[in-house]
Amino acid sequence: MFKKFLWRDCVFIIVLITAIALPAYIHTNYPQAFSRFFYPVEAWFTKRDLRCSKNAPHFLRQLLIEMIDEQKSLNNQVAFWHNGQLFHCESGWEDGFRGEKPMRVNSRFRYASVTKVLTSALVLHAINEQKLSLDSKIIELLELPAPKDPRVAAITIKMLLEHSAGFDRLKTYMPMLTMDVKPWCPTNLAQLSKTKLDFDPETQFQYSNVGYCLLGAAIEKAYGRTFQSVAEDYFQLKKYGIAFVGDRFLPDEIQYDYRFESFYSEFYLKHFDFKDSLYAVGGLSGSAADIVQLLAALPKEAPLTIFSHNHTPCSINMLDACYGYALQPYQASGQSYTLWGKSGFFPGVNTDVFLDEQGNILATLRAASAKKTADTLLLRQYAYSLMNEYVNQK
């Protein structure tokens, strides 16, 4: 009897130690796997406390649920501008799951490449003021040496705006977002003259960060001031609470979730040159409400607006197949509604803005990396379907 008691006692102790030690070991050595495992539980709690402004359209809440369930982001903002009124919803916390700071309407996120919409708007404003031209040659504008690749001499402002200048980041190493490598743009612009293009200009659309860095340099040349100061004056950034990020997180910036990142965590910020190189590419921060209000207040300029585009045929029924001068148009097959958008991504954050020509503006900010890039495309299609339904039922 005593031996049986000892045996049972030993088994109990082993099971108890394993139950305590195994989770601790996994949490210590495989923190991402641990946090991924518990995500469904955290998501359930988060969805119990979605916060929306009065009379916010129901589709904003639907978007939040999609962002939590499918985009794997607990801490989110959505903002919608309609008929001169702002509506918004938030989920989660600024400081992580069950934190002390619930997500607010003015909580600060990095906008990532959504910044490019404002860069484009600034360039189009300069063109409307006749300080630049769509046909301005970037080599001539920046007073650079004759290029080794003669095709570089043909690059214009228009080509840079619509990502058709000849840069393909999937083919040629361009160190705009490469760890511990100082980009040559905008601090060593003469390197452009040594660059070999990946395709003949205006024969393809290929997304390019270096192209938008060059647009930032064009603004500085046109106005004789820093890009940041020109942007501050034209957009009145402080009025909207929008600020440029530097080489560290801002004091009021929210905490990002990297559990579905394969490599990066918050350390990434130390290895990229946000301060000197990325300000025109992905350098702005603010809330979803901030960006929709700023876009709604953009001056009504002519002849060019952020909806302007080249009339080269493209597949508007496919995401990322068409580029305007500031935004990407999308119209689902069989539909007549066109939604213009821009997406952004940094480790731990995904962003989108959507606009239509009726004045509706939607922004979605997620403080987490998606599980797969394809998931972010599904969100954009879902946003289109919700906006299409909402606008057409009015």
Swiss-Prot record:
Name by which UniProt lists this protein: Putative fimbrial assembly protein FimD, serogroup D
InterPro entries per UniProt: Beta-lactam-related, Beta-lactam/transpept-like, Beta-lactam_class-A_AS, Diverse_Enzym_Activities
Q: Which organism is it from?
A: Dichelobacter nodosus
Q: Which domain of life is it from?
A: Bacteria
Q: Which Gene3D superfamilies match?
A: DD-peptidase/beta-lactamase superfamily
Q: Which UniProt keywords apply?
A: Fimbrium biogenesis
Matching PROSITE patterns, A to Z?
BETA_LACTAMASE_A
Q: Record's Pfam families?
A: Beta-lactamase (PF00144)
